[in-house]
Amino acid sequence: MNSITRRVLLGCALLAIFAVGVVIGQNKFGQPKSVLHIVTVKWKEGTTDAQKQKAIDGIKTMASKYDGIKNVWLKPLKVQGTDAVMVMEFKDEAALKAYVDTPAQKEWYEVYIPIRGQSQTHDITN
C-alpha cells in the first residue's frame, strides 16, 4: 500500500471517529406520551412522621398493584409552600383515566385522605 492510500485511509478513519463523537455528544431528548401525575400536599396538623411515611410508602404499593403506573418519584429535593411532593408516571392518558377508583387507589386513599390537609394535583403530558 503506498503512502497516499494510507493517508487517505487514516484521514477517513479520523473523520469517522470525529463523526461518531459528534453524534454521541448531541443533546437528545424525547417527548413521551406518558403522563406525570404530580401531587403536592400539606399534611394535616398533628400528622405523625409514621403516618406520612405510610402514605408515601403506599404509593409504591399502589404502583405495584396497578399496571398503568410506570415509575414513581417520592423524594423531593426542594419543596416550596407544601410539605411533600409525590409523582407517578402513567403509561399514557388512558392509564391515568383508568386508575381513578381502582382498588389500588381506594386502598391508598384510606391511608392518605385522613392525613391530607391541602393538596394540588397537576397532570402533564406531550
Show which residues each predicted segment covers.
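Hydrophobic alpha-helical segments, especially transmembrane helices
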Residues: 7-8, 53, 98, 106
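C-terminal partner/receptor-binding element of secreted or periplasmic proteins
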Residues: 114-122, 126
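Conserved catalytic core of Hanks-type protein kinase domains
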Residues: 89-90, 115
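Short, exposed beta-strand-loop hairpins at the edges of beta-sheets
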Residues: 97-100, 107-113
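Bacterial N-terminal signal peptides that target proteins for export
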Residues: 2-12
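Short alpha-helical segments used as structural interaction elements across diverse proteins
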Residues: 3-4, 34, 49, 113
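Short S/T/G/P-rich N-terminal loop/turn motif that feeds into the first structured element of a domain
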Residues: 17-84, 91-101, 123-126
